[in-house]
Regions:
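Class I SAM-dependent methyltransferase Rossmann-like catalytic core
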Residues: 14-50
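N-terminal auxiliary segments of SAM/dcSAM-dependent transferases
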Residues: 1-10
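S-adenosylmethionine/decaboxylated-SAM
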Residues: 29, 41-216
């Protein structure tokens, strides 16, 4: 079963919000990370449309996908987003396949974390954020999450993230999954798990490799 989400309309909500659109078009391209402007607009648009009380992101990194959520929360005038990232090279490298693991092992995680916190302060959105500097497997996810963005490890840990978030979403809550075609198929197994537990796939961006699931 597939229920369509009109992503173009959702992105337009973000474009129509002058402050949010300006931040995404000017700030996002300057940040470390891989979130596209299209995905950033979608995340912000979902927040603007759904008016969530609670959002959660696994794999906050430099904030390239987290900040659009915060900008939209600020525009809404309330809500909170939890960002989870250990900022630890050992943890990051352990969650990847050879080749990728070497890259993560040499990355200056401290510098990325420093940049992220500087962005929170510079954009005046820290009050909407709760940052948890831990492995996602060590975090007890709260209940009644409205919007979740899962973009941490994409191997077995990524599947476990999806598995653990499944019962924590509110009814009609939305899960955005990144790198769905990652080597090893862990995220695809996560999609199957969500489908088996009452979620529907509402949108899939094949070119950019992410999708949107919604709890029925």
């Amino acid at each position: 079963m597939k229920t369509k989400i009109d992503v173009e309309s959702i992105m337009q909500l973000a474009r129509d919000c002058a402050q949010v659109n300006s931040m995404i078009s000017t700030a996002i391209p300057t940040m470390d990370g891989w979130c596209t402007s299209e995905k950033a607009l979608t995340l912000a648009g979902l927040v603007l449309q759904m008016k969530p009380k609670l959002c959660l992101e696994i794999g906050t990194y430099a904030g390239r996908s987290f900040l659009p959520i915060l900008w939209a929360l600020k525009e809404n005038g309330g809500g909170k987003a939890i960002g989870i990232d250990p900022y630890d090279a050992k943890v990051s490298s352990e969650q990847e396949f050879p080749g990728n693991s070497e890259w993560w092992a040499t990355l200056d995680h401290g510098l990325i974390e420093k940049k992220f916190h500087a962005f929170l302060k510079a954009f005046g959105v820290a009050q909407y954020a709760e940052i948890i500097k831990k492995k996602s497997s060590d975090v007890d996810f709260p209940n009644e999450i409205d919007i979740a963005h899962i973009d941490g490890g994409h191997c077995e840990g990524g599947f476990l993230d999806i598995q653990r978030i499944t019962p924590k979403m509110r009814i009609r809550g939305v899960v955005v999954l990144d790198d769905i075609q990652w080597v090893g198929g862990a995220v695809l197994r996560g999609i199957d798990h969500l489908l088996e537990n009452g979620y529907v796939e509402c949108y899939r961006n094949v070119e950019q490799n992410w999708n949107i699931m919604q709890r029925g």
